[in-house]
Amino acid sequence: MNPQYKKGVLELCVLSLLKKRNCYGYEISEYLSEHIDIADGTVYPILRKLKADGLLTTYLQEESGGPPRKYYALTKLGRETYQTDRAEYLKFAQTVQTLLKEEEEANDKK
């Protein structure tokens, strides 16, 4: 798959996961890796950017048998941004799907 396709939606995927529940970085990386072919280390720059943009906040949580983990949570702005970006992405994806279908139908008629 073209890396540019993935790059454009990874932030939305991170926001989507964090809308469901707070997660620590490795957990986010593992979840995305199960569904999308991403390189190691892809998620942490995204998390830093989203936090710098005010979309995420972090907190430390003690874990039994190990050091505390840094958890990520959506801020109010993060939830609002997710809703807006999700709607825009779905509209865009629908438009692309329509264009591809029209092209396919035109080619079938030839």
Annotated model-derived regions:
Residues E80-K110:
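Amphipathic alpha-helical dimerization/coiled-coil segments
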Residues N2-Y44, Q61:
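N-terminal helix-turn-helix DNA-binding core of bacterial DNA-binding proteins
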Residues P45, K49:
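Alpha-helical DNA-recognition elements
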Residues E63-R86:
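Basic, amphipathic "hinge/linker" alpha-helix immediately C-terminal to the N-terminal HTH DNA-binding motif
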